[in-house]
A protein has these predicted regions:
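Extracytoplasmic/lumenal domain signature
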Residues: 1-7, 12-20, 24-69, 74-177
Length: 177
């Protein structure tokens, strides 16, 4: 026997607050919560972002297809990131629970359950995104091997990372205009 709303994703604790999610199917309800770690007092509950009517990545259909946690939640500054499987993580204001951003990926494009972040950048499915706006022109730093095999930080953009994924490895990393 299982609940209609099992705990999903990994719990994250920051500044004495526990953030967690429950629910699988948007039609049954998805719940993202923030509670005091010491008392369990509910600080906020977002139960609306799981029922967003939106275009689907296949065949031009629309459906209720909001946020469902499918990976460990991540706190970066005043943002809570909720990995959602195939899509880019949903972003919430961690102080209020206000839904800020979510977008389904087109078929065969990347999303992921594994998400990590630092500063104003988060990495999801091997791609780095600016936390304010997911923009292919966003400037980012990525760590990669140089021609002599040494790990180095490279200034680039999200779009160039995506472009380079399509190139044969023999061409190396193309970072110019």
């Amino acid at each position: 026997v299982i609940s209609r709303w099992p705990a999903r994703g990994g719990v994250v604790i920051s500044d004495g607050v526990v953030y967690w999610a429950a629910g699988i199917w948007q039609s049954e309800g998805i719940f993202i919560r923030a509670q005091r770690a010491d008392t369990g007092k509910l600080l906020w509950l977002n139960d609306k972002s799981g029922g967003i009517e939106m275009a689907q990545p296949h065949g031009g259909a629309t459906a209720k297809s909001g946020v469902t946690a499918q990976g460990h939640l991540v706190v970066i500054g005043n943002r809570l990131l909720v990995p959602t499987g195939r899509a880019v993580p949903a972003v919430f204001d961690r102080g209020t629970g206000q839904f800020l951003y979510y977008r389904l990926q087109q078929n065969t494009h990347r999303g992921a359950t594994a998400t990590m972040g630092h500063g104003d950048v988060f990495i999801n499915g091997g791609l780095a995104y600016d936390l304010g706006v997911v923009d292919p022109r966003a400037s980012i730093k990525v760590r990669m091997k140089s021609e002599n095999g040494v790990n180095v930080w490279v200034d680039t953009t999200v779009g160039r990372i995506i472009f380079n994924e399509a190139l044969p490895p023999v061409l190396g990393f193309r970072n110019g205009e």
